[in-house]
Amino acid sequence: DANTNPWGYKLSWSPSSLIGASKRTARVLIDEKEILWPDGETYENVFLYDVPDLGVFEAYANADSTLYKKGYGIPEAKTIYRGTLRYPGWCETICYLNKIKFFETDVRPTKGMSIAQFTSIQAGYPGDPREALCKRLGLEPWSSFILRMEWLGFFEDTILPFESCSPRDVISLLFDKKLVFGPSERDMVVLCDEVVGEYPGGKRKQYKSTLIDFGVPGLWTSIARTTGVPPAIAVRFILEGKISTPGLLAPMSKEIYEPVLEELKNEGIVLEETKEYV
């Protein structure tokens, strides 16, 4: 209900972390074959994913999925894919931004330079930034990417507040300015798990778990609650002696995830589960 901009995204966490993820390398296991997508290529390998009651999202691989094979003790797994969901259009936008190297960290002098001038220089053509991007990327002025760039402020004559900066600094500045929640708006976190098991005789059964959680305006964001409450519960369990294994642990053992998931129900963080033969 707060999806009110052409980017289909608002920030309830660090802009720099979101931007850093745009260059992240991803690795997945598909049909027993490892596939590596370096330097943001994962955004070029996207598929559509339907979430009941919410609609269709884009899904793309996030970081190294193959680690879960050992972590969860499932050496027989043929496919392991950890992905991120976004509203349609996000991956196209990130791909174009990667092509014009707007996520790079090379610093250059920008004293007295406008955002529009910076955009033209980054696109490699002097003059109008819209025309520069269209020439560089082979797009029409009315394309969705160009319209998103206009809305975010890339074509404005506003002077950059830096004597020197990188392309990443500019996009972070605009993200922080425009991709924000209003005081009465709430964020949403969606988590979907799918596990398909094959049984003797060839029968295959699919297990699905879905979490849809919303923040509360003026109190907390969903991203803060769903990432902060689980480790807080784990800390309490350590103090109570319910978790006794020493060291820095990922929540991949039953000693950790079973009691934490059970306690999360009391906080209203619940995954709805379904299963069916496929």
Language-model regions, residue ranges each:
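C-terminal catalytic/substrate-binding lobe primarily of soluble NAD(P)-dependent oxidoreductases
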Residues: 1-278
